[in-house]
């Protein structure tokens, strides 16, 4: 399978919860408000150089437990423009290479354009309160989440996509 993980529904719907349920999630509602703000979108544009962003944002929480993974892909679906991940793993138990669960970035094969290499060129461990982001580019933004080897140490994150007003050129 392309993936094995546990994921919530889209956090864009958090304001549609009944008041009793919403009262249990005030911090998540504040984070969603910040991530969806015009100011944060301007920051994303400045940092990534991604160009114009639409108002559309996707956002969900994910848990990768022992054995969970996400195979190599490029995130090109519809108008996705910037992929981002905020890591929320336990700060008292820093993530190590032995735990697995790294974000893997893949270079392209020289002989075959738009084809990722078999091996990643970089691995980034999910450090607490860190954010990874990259521009979604057809045939280039290949990445994966390495299988989680740790038995009692879940890889927790909030992740999503900022969208462009139109679909990218070169999308197949």
Outline where the language-model segments fall.
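Non-heme Fe(II)/2-oxoglutarate
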Residues: 1-46
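Short, functional N-terminal and low-complexity linear motifs
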Residues: 7-13, 51-52, 111-113, 125-127
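Membrane-targeting and insertion segments and their boundary/processing signals
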Residues: 14-18, 55-58, 119
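Active-site-proximal binding-pocket segments
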Residues: 31-35, 40-46, 50-57, 62-67, ...
């Amino acid at each position: 399978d392309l993936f094995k993980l546990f994921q919530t529904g889209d956090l864009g719907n958090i304001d549609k919860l009944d008041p009793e349920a919403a009262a249990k999630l005030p911090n998540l509602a504040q984070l969603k408000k910040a991530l969806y703000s015009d100011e944060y979108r301007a920051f994303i544009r400045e940092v990534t150089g991604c160009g114009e962003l639409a108002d559309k944002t996707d956002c969900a929480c994910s848990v990768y437990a022992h054995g969970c993974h996400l195979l190599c892909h490029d995130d090109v679906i519809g108008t996705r423009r910037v992929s981002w991940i905020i890591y929320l793993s336990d700060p008292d138990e820093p993530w190590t290479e032995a735990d697995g669960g790294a974000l893997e970035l893949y270079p392209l094969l020289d002989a075959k354009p738009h084809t990722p290499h078999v091996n990643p060129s970089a691995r980034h461990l999910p450090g607490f309160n860190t954010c990874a982001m990259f521009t979604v580019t057809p045939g280039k933004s290949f990445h994966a989440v390495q299988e989680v080897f740790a038995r009692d140490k879940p890889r927790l994150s909030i992740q999503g996509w900022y969208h462009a007003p139109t679909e990218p050129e070169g999308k197949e």
